[in-house]
C-alpha cells in the first residue's frame, strides 16, 4: 500500500493544471483502498497510511498547479478520514486534537483554511469539547491583549482574535450551543451573519419567535453599513419561512412579493408561489409575470421557461430590439431558444441570432464554433418560417461588421451557401489514414 501511495503521488514530477484532475482522481482511488481498511477493522493500519498520505500531499504542493483547488479539497477529505480512523482505533483524543491544531497552525499552502467546518462534523463529542477548550484558550489569550472599544466590530480585531473567534462560532453552531454563541457575540459584537446563524439555531429548536427576533436584528444591522463577508443574504428568505411557521402566511407572502419586485428570478418566483394559496395561484402567476416583464428581461425569460409560457415569451421576444437580447448571457437565453423552436420558430431564430452575435461581437475566437451553431439554427428557423429577409439582414450585418474575423467568416459563408455541415472523420478513419501516411514512401 505504501508503494501505491508513492506511485500515485509521484514526488519529483510536476503536475500541470490540465493533468491535475486526473492526478487527484488517482489519489482518490488510493484513498478508497485505505478507507476500506477502516471498514474491515484495520483502523490502526489505516491511520499510519493516512499519516503518510497527508504528509505526501503536502510535499506535492510545490509540484502541482492546483489553481482549481482539487488537491486542496482532496486533502480536506483525507484529513477528516484520518481523524475518523484515529477515533475508530481508540487513539488518545487529546493527541488527535493537538495534531489537528498543529496542522492548522503550520499551514503554508492553505490546505487547512476553514477546515474546522468539516473537522467538527467528524470529531466525536469528547474530541469536540477538547477542540473547543483549546480554541477558547487561544481566543481568550489573544482577546485579553486588545484595547476594548464599545463600537468595535469583529472585523476590526487582530487576526489571532478573528481566527479563533470564527472557529469557536463554527463549533457552537455544530454543537447547537446557542448560549455560548450569544455570550461570544456579547463580548465581541454581533454581525448580520451571526444573527442568521443564531436565528437558525433557534429555528432548529422550534423557537420561531426568538428566531424571528434575531432575523429582525440582522436586517437592521445590514442597513447600518457595509459588512463585507459578514453580510447575510439569507435573512429575508429566513424571515419569510419563520413568518409562515408562525401562522403569518399573509405577512410572509407580502415580504416575498416585495423581494420579487426587486429581483424577479426563478428563485424569487418559486419562493413567492410556495406561499400562495392554491385558489390564487393563477392570479399571482400572472401578476409575477407582468412585473418581471416590466423589470428584467433575463428574469422574465427564466420564469417563462420554467413555467412553459411559450406564447407570452414569444410575443415579448418579438417586441424587443436585437441589442437587448445580445446583452444577455447564454445561460438566460439558450433554454428559451430550444423551448421556443418547436412552435415559435421566429422568436427562437431571433434568440439564436442574438446568441451568435454576442459571441462574435466579443471576439472570443475559442467560442466561434458555438456562434456558428447558433447561426445555423437561426438560418433553418428563418427559412422554415418563410422569413428569408430577416436572415439576409443578419448575414449583411455579420459581413459588414465581422468580415475580418478570418477564423470565423469562412465557416459562416458555408452556412450562408447552405453547404451541409461536414461530419468529422471517425477516429478509426483518421488513424488508418495516418498509418498509411506513416508507412508509405512518397512516389
Language model region names:
Residues 1-443:
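Eukaryote-biased, non-catalytic alpha-solenoid scaffold regions
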